[in-house]
Amino acid sequence: MPDRVGLELIATQLGEAIPGSVLETEYFREQAALHVDPAAVRRVLGELRERHGFRALMSVHGVDYYPHEPRLGVHYQLLDMSRVDRIAVKLRVSTDAPRVDSVTPDWPTANHQEREVYDMFGVSFDGHPDLRRILMPEDYEGHPQRRDFPIGGEPVLFTHNDATSPGWTR
């Protein structure tokens, strides 16, 4: 992990290359993170890859910060394999318009991960080549990982288990 000084240096260099992109830095329990403007995430990740050696996108995942606003977050975990360094890039979007640019054109490993964030949290990724649900049925309403999602009620009947699975009733 970059230490505190290294993180601030990276943030400064990113700020020079992409003004206004880095909103805050966070160093907690030896984990370095950059909080970035959602409009700049694709450029920030590209800069981290080309200029700072973070060539592997390990994870894209969603977060719900309910009851705080902006409520929804997307986190990216990058790895520099030559130095075994990790850095997190975090952004937040409101529930009114949860949109962010897709990084799939630059990082193909993000494809299914962005679809999962879309499916579970409802964050749309502009420019994604195939943004549709990946875990839930296409006609499913809601996003199950949001904190205000109602738990309980009727089980979801998937097409492969509607009449054949024991224990499911109609």
What are these regions (language model features)?
Residues 1-170:
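Terminal low-complexity/charged segments
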